[in-house]
């Protein structure tokens, strides 16, 4: 799975840096895998420069384990199919769903093989709609579909004025995750603390606290601590807490560096005194500007787009790409769990390392080597 993991990570970190720089010092949260999937869906029908721009942005030319650096897009698509099949199947330990839809004006006729590939490879919805004559009803139906696909958790991806009757093709993408910590925090241990951030100077936050064994690494360059918080079901959140500011970490984000920072040989199981703020981030991004900044210009340009492998009926291009994601981090993860042996703390603890996230930090949520989410908490 190395090539998909690497391509998804490199694309996600490129996108994170672009989104972070364009929105100032705010919180950031998105699913790179989800947006990666949406763009791969477009790649199925892209031709010429359109296809080459997508390949470059998605790092489809990353060398494989065999050292072959030629375009390995078909292999990546097969890997992605397997990952998405696992994600969208039901799991008793967590809820995770990705919903991706391609909606085009009804004058365009989707190619049958494109619909089959989109549905079979990515479980995506492909549908002809009436933007021209009934844009509000179309918006309502798309929002309702996303709401159903995410079990009612994500609503109104498309706002009241987000679509116009001149829309040609719209990609809508939403992702929802609900997990339970393996080692839940205790609510009575939550403290009120000040969060040190220029974004919200002096803000008092609910700081969760627990002391037990965690996987932790201390990185010298860039200087930071990396803490692993495990969810049930093989998913982990890795929190990157800098000694000083985040700039150096952000500039060094790469798949290889993340693998190094979270390497099992480097992360030692040790007693850690953890302080982590509760936080909730809900983001609804219109991705066009961000993706253009990564070199994906042609798919959004009526005069340049070549998406002839998707549909016939005229020159097709992407009018809008919407992405919505939501996360809430609390004591239980997201819902209370019964006590297990993981929640039993020894009475006599050895000296602990302190991990105090009372300043801005980065985090990724991943399963195995696949990054599901990337985020930045500037102000909880």
UniProtKB/Swiss-Prot annotation:
GO cellular component, one term: extracellular space
Protein localization: Cytoplasm
Keyword Signal annotated: no
GO MF, one annotated term: serine-type endopeptidase inhibitor activity
SMART domains linked to this entry: SERPIN (SM00093)
Site (Reactive bond): 347-348
Example of a GO biological process term: positive regulation of glomerular mesangial cell proliferation
Organism the protein comes from: Mus musculus (Mouse)
Name of the gene this protein is made from: Serpinb7
SUPFAM superfamilies reported in the protein's UniProt record: Serpins (SSF56574)
The protein's name: Serpin B7
Similarity comment: Belongs to the serpin family. Ov-serpin subfamily.
Function: Might function as an inhibitor of Lys-specific proteases. Might influence the maturation of megakaryocytes via its action as a serpin.
Assigned keywords, A-Z: Cytoplasm, Phosphoprotein, Protease inhibitor, Serine protease inhibitor
Positions carrying Phosphoserine: 217
UniProt-listed PANTHER family: SERINE PROTEASE INHIBITOR, SERPIN, SERPIN B7
């Amino acid at each position: 799975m190395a090539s998909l993991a690497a391509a998804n990570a490199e694309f996600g970190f490129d996108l994170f840096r672009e989104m972070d720089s364009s929105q100032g010092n705010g919180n950031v949260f998105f699913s790179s895998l989800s947006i990666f999937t949406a763009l791969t869906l477009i790649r199925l029908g892209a031709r010429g420069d359109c296809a080459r721009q997508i390949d470059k942005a998605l790092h489809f030319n990353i060398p494989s384990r065999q050292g072959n650096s030629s375009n390995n897009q078909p292999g990546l698509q097969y890997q992605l199919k397997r990952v998405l099949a696992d994600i969208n199947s039901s799991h008793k330990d967590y809820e995770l769903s990705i919903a991706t839809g391609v909606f085009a004006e009804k004058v365009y006729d989707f190619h049958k093989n494109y619909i089959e590939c989109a549905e079979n490879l990515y479980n995506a919805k492909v549908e002809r709609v009436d933007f021209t004559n009934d844009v509000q009803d179309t918006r309502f139906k798309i929002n309702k579909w996303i709401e159903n696909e995410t079990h009612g958790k994500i609503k109104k991806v498309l706002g009241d004025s987000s679509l116009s009757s001149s829309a040609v093709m719209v990609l809508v993408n939403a992702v929802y995750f609900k997990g339970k910590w393996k080692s839940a925090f205790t609510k009575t241990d939550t403290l009120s603390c000040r969060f040190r951030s220029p974004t919200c100077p002096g803000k008092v936050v609910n700081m969760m606290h627990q002391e037990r064994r965690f996987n932790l690494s201390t990185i010298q360059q860039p200087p930071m601590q990396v803490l692993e918080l495990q969810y049930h079901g093989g998913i982990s959140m890795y929190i990157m807490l800098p000694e000083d500011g985040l700039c150096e970490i952000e500039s060094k984000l790469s798949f290889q560096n993340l693998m190094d920072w979270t390497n099992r040989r480097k992360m030692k199981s040790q007693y850690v005194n953890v302080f982590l703020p509760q936080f909730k981030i809900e983001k609804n991004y219109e991705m066009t500007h961000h993706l253009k900044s990564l070199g994906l210009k042609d798919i959004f340009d009526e005069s340049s787009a070549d998406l002839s492998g998707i549909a016939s009926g005229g020159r097709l291009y992407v009018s809008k790409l919407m992405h919505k994601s939501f996360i809430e981090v609390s004591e239980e993860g997201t819902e209370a769990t019964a006590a297990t042996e993981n929640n039993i703390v020894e009475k006599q603890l050895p000296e602990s390392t302190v991990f105090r996230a009372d300043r801005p930090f980065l985090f990724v949520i991943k399963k195995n080597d696949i990054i599901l989410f990337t985020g930045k908490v500037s102000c909880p």
